[in-house]
Every structure is written in C-alpha cells, then in structure tokens.
Design a protein with these regions (language model features):
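Active-site mouth of glycoside hydrolases
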Residues: 179-192, 197-200, 205-404, 409-417
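N-terminal secretory signal peptides that target proteins for export/translocation
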Residues: 1-10
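Aromatic-rich peripheral "rim/lid" segments of glycoside hydrolase catalytic domains that contact
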Residues: 502-595
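Extracellular glycoside hydrolase catalytic/binding regions
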Residues: 181-182, 343-519, 539
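Bacterial N-terminal signal peptides
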Residues: 14-26
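Sec/Tat signal peptide C-region and signal peptidase I cleavage site
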Residues: 27-31
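Extracytoplasmic
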Residues: 32-166, 172-175, 592-719
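Glycan-binding loop/region signatures in secreted carbohydrate-active enzymes
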Residues: 204-255, 429-431, 436-476, 481, ...
Length: 719
C-alpha cells in the first residue's frame, strides 16, 4: 500500500489543498512563473497517492510514478501568470507500459476543469513521449493541479505555452481595420462606439462546417443509399480508412468548399454579416471529450478574419450540438435520430463546456456580432428550451461580458422566455426562422406571382387610419419584439427560390423591411451545388445565392463505400476550382439605389407608413406600390447631383379621380401630382410635372395627400 493512501479523498481535493493553495498565492513576495512555463511533476506543493523515482528521461532527475485513478498533484508553489485570455497549449511528458491512463488539468482545488487528455502506450515505463492538449485560460495568476481519472503511467513534467491567436481585438497586428463592436440598445442592434443603428443583412454559410447533403444535390452515396447526414459520411469513412484519415478528408472538404472567392462574392452581393453554422466536433475532440481539438479554432478564426477584412460581421451558430437538438427526423444538426441533448446529462454538460470555450476564445472580438446558442432546437418543449437557454446564457456571460447572445426560438415562438430584460440581462437577443411559402406556410401559393404576392403580404401587413404601422403578418412580430425591447434576428429565410423572376427584388425588399423594423436578417443559404449546375437563368434558381456553373462546373456523384480515399479527396477538392455563377437578379437588387435619370421603383422605399406592394401587369412586370390611404407615405434616400429644375414622371393607376401625390422633403412640398382616373387599378398612365431640387444626399418622400391610387415607378430627369 502506498504511504499516502491513508490520507486520500478519492476523486476530490482536500480542504488542506484548497487552504494551502490560497495561502501560498497570498504570501508576500511569492514568485510566479511567466510563459512558457515548465513545471517538474515532482515539484508539487501537495499530492495524494503518488511516489517519486529516478528517471532516465533526458535531463535526469525524478519523475512521478505509481499513478492510479483518483490520485492528484497540486502545484500551488508554482503559480503561472497567464497574460491574456485565450488558447494555450499544455504539454505533458509521459511514459506508459500499456496506455489507457488520463490526465485532467484543473485549478488547484478542482474549481475549474480545463479538460482531459489520454496517455498512449509509449512502450515502457521509461520510454518517454510528449503529448499535448489545447485549453482556454483566463488572464491572471493560476495555481494548477493535475487530477488522474485513470492511472498506469509516469509523468516527468508539464509545460504551458501561448498559442498565436487571431482573436485579439487589437488592430495593431492585422492589416485591416477592426469593425466596431455591436451591442443592444432597446430593440436595436447598434454600433457600440456611436450608438447608431446597424442594419445587418447577410447569409448563412451552410454545408461547410456542418454538412447538409441536399445542398450538394444529394449526389453523395454509400452502399446503404443516399447520404443524408454528416454522421453517416464520417462513420463510413472511419470504418474504411480509420479516424485519422477520416479527419484528414474532412479537412480537405473544409479547405475547399469555402474559399476567399466566396467572401469576395458575399461582399459584392451586398452582405455585411455572415452566420456561420458549425458542428460541435469542429471544436471539441469527439474522441476525448472536454478537450478542444488541436485545430479547433482554425476555420472560425479564418472566417471571422476574412469577413472582417471585407467589412462583414459574423454570427457563430452552434448548428449541431453533441447528441443533437433537433427533432428525430431532422438532419441539419449532424445526425438523423433522436435529439439526445435534452435527455443526456453528459451531452448537456459538454454543450455548456463548449460555449465556455467559445466565449473565452472570442471575448473582445468585435467582428463577432453575436453568439447563436442553438439552431432549431425542435427536440424539446418551449419551456425546457427557455430554461436551458438561460443556463447557456449564464455560462457565456461568465466569460464574455459584452457580446450579444441569441436566445433560440422554438417552433412555437419565443413567449416562453418572457421578457429577458426583466431578468436584468443585457446584450441579449432572440431569433426566429421565417419561411413563407414553405412547410405548410401558404405553400399552396402558385409559383412566381402567387408566391411573390404572398411574401409581399407577409412583409407589409394591414394598416388603418388609427393604426398606420399595421397589424397582422410580420407586423405582429414587430409589435411583439418592440414590446419586449429586445433585438431580433431572422436567422433563416428564403425569398427567391419559389418566386421566379420576382425573387431578386423580393430578396432586397425582405432585407429592407426587416431592417426597417430594426431586425437583423441572414438568408438560407449562401451556396448550393448540383450535378448539372446552372446556366444563370434567374427565373429558376435553387436555394443558394450562388451555385456551380453548368459551363464546366458540373459534378458527378460519388459512392464513399467504394471510392478510394484519393478519389474522395479529389471529389472534395473540386469545390475550390469549379466555376460558379451568382443570381444576378439578387446581385442587382441588393446593390440597387435610387438615382436621378432612371426609374425608381415605387415599392423600393426605405421606410413607409401604410403602403403595400403587389405584382403588376404594367409594362416590364415586377411590383407596384398601392393600398394608398390619406397621409400614407414612402421615403427614398437619393443623391441629387446638381441643384435645379427636374422633370418628375410618375407612373400611376386608379379607378377614381381626385387622388393627390406629393413629392416632399422634410415635410415641405416640392411638387403635387393630381392622379387621374386611369380606368382601373392596373391601367397605367404617366403624369409629369416640374420640381426644383437642392443638390446633395437627401431623403425624398412620396406623400399621399389623397389616396386611392397605385404607383409603379417615378423618375427625376435634369432639365
């Protein structure tokens, strides 16, 4: 029996250890190590269960041996100063005859668990190797301890070194301007530096850091049929090639599916925020739980940086938690099957640990707009979701005091949260995913015009003289969000794929309306691919803003049960070089702005009161603005290049006479148009007057002095 066995507390630290750790750290003049910090294992301040022996490792001296489960060593006499919060590598010099042991790094006393690493079979008790784990540490003085979940090895020393991190909020070490942080102000997302509203409009990079195989046309298969979830793909590759080769192939996919050209194209299509869905095992070592992977932050860091270089924020979206959070039939959380996150205590604890790691990593990183705690958590009830989400909120807030944290919406809504502000929370937001026209939401509306009008009704609601702001449809959500004074994200929406030729303009209008409410919005999704690709015809477009081109970008399917590792690698590599095409209608409308000398579509107002939009039969198609009642209005930011007289043409229709349209600025009339009886709501005429305008950037408004007419477009031409 070991001499110290009589005074052991199995699996726990002693009260003496806790006292001794505190006493040493508070002693005047006590020396503290700076990084890199190497600590000889035998230099513990106190221990339980271990013994020392001479070592034949390089450098000589002693090693700690006779290590068994529940032993521990505390190093309170060797405190280490961590200069900044972030990632650090911890190396352990170990030897083992059989392997299977494990080391858990903790704060002395066990207050904080930094993760566990497995000790391999090194070939003998004095055959030494160095193993490494990556941990996140907070700035300050640490007194570390080593706990032993499983023994059977010797330990000579351990060493802590800093990892070069791209998560610093400083601009001095990067070649681009840092974005200002975003914070909550009531129901608004605002620039933390000047408190001005930030209109976030972006996309989701789906199928990259968590795969959804329908987004690649469903052309990946195995011997059991089509691959529908990432778990199936990884399982087949692991069984055939081993875990290490599977991991290498997954890295090839991630390196090639999204590249810098994607970020260039996102910026060119008017995006300023990118939601990044990821699977838990991108960060946590699935083979060694409670440990971050050696490459844990590679892809998130890279994406945050590439987005910020182009002036775009990021939202970090845990799309797939360990065990799965979605309903059993869903594949988007990584694995089809029961949502075990809600019933497995270990999975839930690991998810809290994961968010602790993320919060430590990106604390102070201003380019991260928000943390999205869980995507589409349909596998539980709304009350359980709310309670668990508040748990995650507290985990994150303990390590990151400033980032906005998104409380996930349930498929029944957000009411279970109550009002987050009543809990004294700050920088908290909520989200929902709105998919008009899909999955039972008016999905019988006809393709094209029918879908376009259904989307238009959702966006513009109903207004009356006593309630010009409107009720019904999206207005009810706006009123609910304003009532709780909490920012809101429409985390997913799809405004083009069923709308045909109307899709590009409806995409822009959706962003405009959501932003006018103060909401952020990210469409689903950035990219999809298919076997044949697209010839660029925007009247028939899939779910991605971009896709592979039919001109040289077609793809054949692959069976991963029979393809070689080299063939799978080649298939994955094609994504970085295949020709891509973007939806040019979306690109045009996302960059459209009102200008003199060309038609200004009336429905493309920035703000409005009481107006609706609908498809039009006028020449050129598209939409018109209508449902005009007295005192309604529409406003348009526009730059007038030179002062002087301009011809104002307005394209109007009405079954009545006596309507009055006023072009105004700051409430002052610039010109008045009397709208004639054109013979019907879709019988169009052009009315013309002259107006005098000042030069410069300004907001011009079309004011409805007397309603009962539609307007398709208007145009200002310098005389």
């Amino acid at each position: 029996m070991k001499m110290s066995q009589q005074c052991r507390w199995p699996g726990k630290w002693s009260a003496f250890a806790l006292f001794f750790s505190s006493a040493l750290l508070s002693s005047p003049g006590f020396s503290q190590a700076s990084l890199p910090a190497s600590i000889q294992a035998e230099n513990y301040s106190h221990m339980s269960g271990v013994q020392l022996e001479a070592t034949s490792d390089s450098g000589g001296g002693q090693n700690v041996g006779w290590i068994e489960a529940n032993d521990w060593m505390a190093y309170s006499s060797n405190p280490v100063t961590i200069p900044t919060t972030g990632a650090y590598d911890v190396e352990y010099r170990v030897a083992s005859q059989a392997g299977g042991g494990s080391i858990r790094l903790e704060e002395a006393g066990g207050a904080t668990n930094y993760g566990t690493i497995t000790v391999p079979n090194t070939g003998g008790w004095q055959t030494w190797t160095t193993i490494k784990q990556r941990v996140n540490l907070t700035a300050g003085t640490h007194s570390f301890g080593i706990a032993i979940p499983a023994g059977g090895f010797n330990l000579n020393w351990f060493r802590i070194t800093a990892v070069a991190s791209s998560s610093s909020s400083s601009s001095s070490s990067v070649g681009w301007a840092r974005l200002p942080a975003i914070k909550q102000s009531g129901a608004q997302w605002v620039n933390a530096a000047n408190n001005q509203r930030v209109d976030l409009r972006g996309t989701n990079i789906g199928n990259w850091l968590i795969q959804e195989f329908w987004m690649m046309g469903g052309i990946m298969a195995h011997n059991g049929g089509t691959i529908n979830d990432q778990c199936t793909l990884e399982s087949v590759m692991s069984q055939r090639f081993g875990n290490a080769e599977k991991e290498r192939l997954m890295k090839v996919f991630r390196d090639h599916y999204i590249t810098t050209r994607d970020f260039d194209m996102m910026k060119a299509m008017g995006m300023n925020v990118i939601r990044i869905p990821f699977l838990y095992s991108l960060i946590e070592d699935e083979y060694n739980p409670y440990n971050v992977r050696p490459d844990a932050w590679q892809y998130l860091d890279w994406a945050i940086n590439e987005a910020e270089k182009r002036g775009m924020y990021t939202i970090l979206d845990l799309h797939g938690a360990v065990g799965g959070q979605a309903a059993a039939s869903e594949q988007h959380d990584g694995c089809i099957g029961a949502a075990q996150l809600w019933t497995n205590a270990n999975y839930w604890d690991r998810t809290k640990w994961l968010w602790d790691m993320i919060a430590q990593r990106y604390n102070g990183r201003s380019a991260v707009a928000a943390y999205d705690l869980l995507n589409e958590p349909w596998g539980t009830d709304a009350t359980t979701l709310a309670n668990r989400s508040y748990e995650l909120f507290n985990v994150v807030r303990a390590k990151d005091a400033s980032h906005i944290i998104l409380l996930p919406g349930h498929n029944s809504g957000i009411d279970a949260y109550g009002n987050p502000n009543s809990r004294g929370l700050t920088n908290v937001a909520t989200w929902m995913h709105f998919y008009p026209g899909l999955w039972g939401w008016n999905d019988t509306a006809t393709y094209g015009a029918g879908q376009a009008n259904m989307h238009a009704n959702w966006l513009h609601c109903n207004s009356t003289a006593t309630n010009p702001a409107g009720t019904g449809e999206s207005c009810d959500w706006r009123n609910r969000i304003n009532g709780i004074q909490t920012p809101f994200l429409v985390g997913e929406f799809q405004p083009w794929t069923l709308l045909g030729s109307y899709g590009g303009q409806m995409t822009r209008k959706t962003y405009d309306i959501y932003n006018s409410y103060g909401w952020a919005a990210t469409n689903w999704a950035w990219k999809t691919t298919s076997s044949g690709g697209s010839n660029g015809d925007t009247s028939s477009w899939a779910w991605g803003m971009i896709t592979n081109s039919s001109n040289g970008g077609g793809m054949s399917g692959i069976n991963v049960s029979s393809a070689s590792a080299a063939q799978i690698e080649t298939w994955f590599r094609q994504f970085s070089t295949q020709p891509l095409v973007r939806n040019e209608s979306i690109a045009y409308w996302m960059n459209w702005k009102a200008q003199t000398g060309q038609r200004i579509e009336a429905e493309m107002f920035k703000d409005h009161s009481g107006i609706r939009m609908e498809t039009t039969t006028d020449t050129g198609g598209g939409f018109n603005a209508g449902s005009t009642d007295d005192n309604d209005w529409m406003s348009y930011p526009i730059n007038i290049p030179t002062a002087g007289n301009y011809t104002l043409d307005v394209r109007v229709s009405s079954p009545y006479a006596g309507g009055t349209l006023v072009l105004s600025r700051n409430g002052a009339d610039l010109g008045v148009v009397t709208v004639p009886n054109t013979g019907g709501w879709q019988n169009w005429q052009t009315a013309t007057i002259t107006v005098n305008l000042q030069a410069g950037q300004q907001d011009l408004a079309i004011f409805v002095r007397k309603g009962g007419w539609n307007i398709n477009w208007w145009q200002l031409t310098k005389q």
